[in-house]
């Protein structure tokens, strides 16, 4: 049981009401689906599973691992999206026109931010194409701290969070999906922090001290 806040925005007036609702099975199912997806995704990204892959399929499998991993991650997310689309749903709020255009414009900015962040690193390595086409290609060993990475340490995750929460319409199913994805993104960011600390050591510690993780500081960045 819980309280659902409902926003009604019409003709320039905003009214805030509270509706008492039972926790719907669809909400729980979607949350569980996202958590299962995130768990499998994280396990497959671990060094232990990569080592098992090399042992079972040989060193050549390492070249194709990231491409296969990315394809599996994309395809296995489709059933989660399907659940959110087909299960019984309930509207929480809808942003009216013309503010919908602002919401959509901010989502486009989030997508552009995601693209810029990828281009600042090594897009082809991230996708796994470089490893597949260039045997022996090594992981980028330069700590990127310029551009978007000067504002936040994980601009890709920031862009993802902005995109999902700036949707012009929110339903109960979408709320469950967004909450699950937010937890997944935050856990992923913390795991990546540990990896980067192992990789870059003191340089990354200094970077952590002067650059926020996900929420950029206002004002000039030194």
Go through each PLM region and give its residues.
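Membrane-interface helix termini and inter-helical loops of multi-pass transporters
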Residues: 52-54, 86-96
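Membrane-interface loop-to-helix entry segments
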Residues: 69-70, 100-112, 146-158
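Transmembrane alpha-helical segments that form the membrane-embedded catalytic/substrate-channel core
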Residues: 33-46, 79, 107-129, 177-197
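Hydrophobic transmembrane alpha-helices
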Residues: 25-40, 138-222
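A generic, lipid-embedded transmembrane alpha helix
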Residues: 68-84
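Membrane-interface helix-loop junction between the first two transmembrane segments
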Residues: 42-60
């Amino acid at each position: 049981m819980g309280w659902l806040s409902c926003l009604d925005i019409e003709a320039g007036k905003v009214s805030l009401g509270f509706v008492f609702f039972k926790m719907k099975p669809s909400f729980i199912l979607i949350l569980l689906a996202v958590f299962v997806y995130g768990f499998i995704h994280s396990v497959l990204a671990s060094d232990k599973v990569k080592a098992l892959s090399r042992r079972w399929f040989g060193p050549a499998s390492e070249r194709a691992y990231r491409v296969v991993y990315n394809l599996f991650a994309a395809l296995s997310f489709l059933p989660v999206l399907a659940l959110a689309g087909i299960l019984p749903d309930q509207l929480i709020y809808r942003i009216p026109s013309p503010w919908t255009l602002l919401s959509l414009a901010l989502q486009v900015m989030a997508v552009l931010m995601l693209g810029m962040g990828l281009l600042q690193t090594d897009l082809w390595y991230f996708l796994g194409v470089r490893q597949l086409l260039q045997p022996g290609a090594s992981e980028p060993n330069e700590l990127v701290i310029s551009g978007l990475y000067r504002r936040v340490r994980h601009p890709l995750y920031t862009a993802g969070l902005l995109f999902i929460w700036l949707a012009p319409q929110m339903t109960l199913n979408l709320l469950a999906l967004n909450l699950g994805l937010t937890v997944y993104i935050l856990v992923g960011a913390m795991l990546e922090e540990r990896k980067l600390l192992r990789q870059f050591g003191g340089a990354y510690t200094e970077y952590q001290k002067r650059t926020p993780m996900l929420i950029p500081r206002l004002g000039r960045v030194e």
